[in-house]
């Protein structure tokens, strides 16, 4: 799931999590080396519509890995593990070196320097 994805590929550490046995709701806080935190949650029966670039709201989440070589390396690893690379690695028109991968649950992860 999402927790394992962020731990394996982006070095997150997860707390023990919270589980409401009555509703089935679960959440985890993931902590990254720079102190950033991300909460992931789910519960049975949640609607998960298809995610596309042509919508409003959250389109992707970006993670900085430090250098071009790490962008390339992580992109290759994700692709070899079966994740769809939808752009890059490349330098964008606004000067960012990045790739974009479709990850768990159709979420787009941008990997940047």
Where are the regions a protein language model picked out?
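Core segments of cupin and vicinal oxygen chelate
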Residues: 1-37
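Vicinal oxygen chelate
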Residues: 28-32, 38, 50-113
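Alpha-helix termination/capping residues and helix-transition junctions
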Residues: 9-11, 55, 83, 103
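A short, acidic/glycine-rich surface segment
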Residues: 15-16, 42-50, 87
